[in-house]
C-alpha cells in the first residue's frame, strides 16, 4: 500500500486508510503509473467501457470491494469502474502477487484505497481483505469482485450481518473461486447473486487457454531458466488452462505427459496426441511438473519421493495446495532459497535437489506479470459489464452462482473483434428463416 496524494479519476476521492501499513518508496508511484499507461494502450475494450461508464454513471454512489491480483491490468479495470462513479477498495487475491508500484500508483494518483503489499503473511493478507470490505468502520460494499473466493467467503464468515445484507451482487473471475461459491450456494450460505465470469466460452478460450498458457510458461522460464525442448513435462489437469499449457509446452519442444481424473478430458488429451498417465507413473519420468487442476494434494509426499534429481515443480492453480509444500519442507535436509528469483532448491537426504517455483503459489503471477493486457482486457471487460448489470438489476437475480448473460459475452467479443479489425458476416433473411423453422428438410 502507498501514501495518498491528490486523487485523479472520475470516482469519488477517498483517503487511503491502508497507507498506514505501507510507506511508498520515492518514485514508486511514477513507475507504476507508467506501467499502467502502457497496459492501457493494449486494453481498448476497457477504454471503450470507461467512456461509456463516464457517460452513463452506472455505479454512482456505489462502493465496490475488489479482491484481485494487484497488477497494471487490474488498475485499468479499477479506473474504468471509477469512471462510472464507483468508490473502489482493493485488496490482493494472493499474498505474493502484488506489484507494489501499481498499488502505489492507484493510491497516490487515483485516490483508491489499496490494501495490499507483496510478501505479506497470511494474517496480514486476510486483514487487508477485511479492510477492503470496510472492517474498520467504513461503509460496506454494494458490489464485490473476487478472484478465488477469499473476499466473498470472508464477507460471509467475518462481516456483520448488516454489511452482508447491503451487497447487491458480485463477480468471480476464477474457476477455483466459482467452485467454492457453488459449494456455498449448495449449502445455502451464499447470500447474494454472483456472476461466474470465468465460466463463459469467451473466457475459457481467451483467458484460460491462451492467457494462462502464455503467462505460466513465462513464469516457469523466468524462475527456472530451463530449456523445455526434449524435457519431459508433466501437466496435471487438462481443462481449459491445463490444455493450453500443454500445447504451449509442446510447441517449445517439450515431451508432454498429462495426468487427469476426468475420462472425457483424458480422451481429449489422447486425441490431441498427448500421453496420459496416472501421477504415480508420471512422477519418476517427469523433469518439469505444472499443476493446473484447481484441486488439492495433486503432488504429495509419495510422489515427491519418486522425483528425479533436478525436477522442477510449478503450480498454475489459484491456491498453494496442489503441491504439498509442507511435505517437501519436511523431507528436505537443507533449503537453498532464491537460487534464482522465485526458485528454492530443496535438498533431500539422498542428495537429490528439487526446485520449487514461487513457493508453490500461482507461478504466472509470482514469477511473472500474469496474463497479457489483451487477455485481461476481455476478461475484465466481461466483469465490468456484469457488475454494471448487477448494479441496475440485481434484484432480478436470486442468491446463487449465475452464468454471464449471453448478450454480455457476445457484446464483449464483438467489441474486441472491432478493435482487432475483424468483421463478421450477418445472417440473411433466408438463413434466419431456415434456422427458425423445423419444416425445412432434405
For each feature predicted by the language model, list its residue ranges.
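A short helix->loop->beta-strand "cap" motif at the edges of active sites that frequently abuts
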Residues: 85-87, 112, 163, 192, ...
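Glycine/serine-rich phosphate-binding loop and adjoining beta1-alpha1 elements at the start
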Residues: 15-59, 92-231
Amino acid at each position: 500500500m502507498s501514501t495518498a496524494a491528490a486523487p485523479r479519476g472520475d470516482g469519488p476521492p477517498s483517503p487511503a486508510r491502508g497507507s498506514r501499513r505501507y510507506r511508498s518508496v520515492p518514485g514508486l508511484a511514477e513507475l507504476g503509473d507508467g506501467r499502467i499507461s502502457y497496459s492501457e494502450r493494449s486494453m481498448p475494450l476497457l477504454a471503450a467501457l470507461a467512456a461509456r461508464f463516464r457517460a452513463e454513471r452506472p455505479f454512482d454512489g456505489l462502493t465496490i470491494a475488489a479482491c484481485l491480483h494487484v497488477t497494471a491490468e487490474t488498475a485499468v479495470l479499477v479506473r474504468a469502474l471509477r469512471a462510472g462513479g464507483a468508490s473502489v477498495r482493493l485488496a490482493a487475491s494472493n499474498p505474493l502477487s502484488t506489484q507494489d508500484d501499481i498499488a502505489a500508483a492507484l493510491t497516490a494518483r487515483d485516490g483508491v484505497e489499496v490494501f495490499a503489499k507483496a510478501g505479506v503473511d497470511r494474517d496480514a493478507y486476510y486483514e487487508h481483505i477485511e479492510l477492503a470490505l470496510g472492517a474498520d468502520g467504513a461503509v460496506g460494499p454494494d458490489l464485490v469482485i473476487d478472484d478465488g473466493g477469499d473476499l466473498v467467503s470472508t464477507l460471509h464468515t467475518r462481516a456483520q450481518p448488516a454489511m452482508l445484507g447491503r451487497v447487491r451482487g458480485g463477480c468471480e473471475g476464477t474457476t477455483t473461486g466459482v467452485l467454492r461459491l457453488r459449494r456455498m450456494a449448495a449449502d445455502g450460505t451464499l447470500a447474494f447473486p454472483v456472476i461466474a465470469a470465468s465460466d463463459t466460452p469467451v473466457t475459457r478460450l481467451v483467458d484460460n487457454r491462451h492467457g494462462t498458457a502464455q503467462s505460466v510458461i513465462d513464469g516457469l522460464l523466468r524462475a527456472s531458466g530451463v530449456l523445455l525442448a526434449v524435457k519431459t513435462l508433466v501437466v496435471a489437469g487438462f481443462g481449459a488452462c491445463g490444455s493450453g499449457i500443454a500445447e504451449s509446452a509442446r510447441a517449445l519442444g517439450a515431451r508432454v505427459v498429462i495426468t487427469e481424473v476426468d475420462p472425457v478430458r483424458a480422451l481429449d488429451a489422447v486425441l490431441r496426441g498427448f500421453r496420459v498417465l496416472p501421477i504415480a507413473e508420471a512422477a519418476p519420468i517427469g523433469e518439469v511438473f505444472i499443476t493446473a487442476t484447481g484441486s488439492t494434494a495433486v503432488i504429495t509426499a509419495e510422489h515427491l519421493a519418486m522425483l528425479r534429481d533436478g525436477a522442477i515443480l510449478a503450480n498454475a492453480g489459484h491456491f498453494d495446495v496442489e503441491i504439498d509444500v509442507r511435505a517437501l519442507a519436511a523431507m528436505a535436509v537443507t533449503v537453498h532459497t532464491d537460487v534464482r528469483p522465485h526458485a528454492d532448491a530443496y535438498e533431500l537426504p539422498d542428495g537429490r535437489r528439487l526446485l520449487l517455483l514461487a513457493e508453490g503459489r500461482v507461478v504466472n503471477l509470482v514469477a511473472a506479470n500474469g496474463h497479457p493486457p489483451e487477455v485481461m482486457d476481455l476478461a475484465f471487460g466481461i466483469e465490468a459489464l456484469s457488475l454494471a448489470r448487477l448494479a441496475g438489476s440485481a434484484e432480478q437475480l436470486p442468491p446463487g452462482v449465475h452464468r454471464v448473460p449471453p448478450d454480455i459475452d457476445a457484446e464483449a467479443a464483438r467489441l474486441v473483434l472491432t478493435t482487432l479489425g475483424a468483421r463478421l458476416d450477418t445472417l440473411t433473411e433466408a438463413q434466419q428463416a431456415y434456422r427458425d423453422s423445423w419444416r425445412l428438410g432434405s
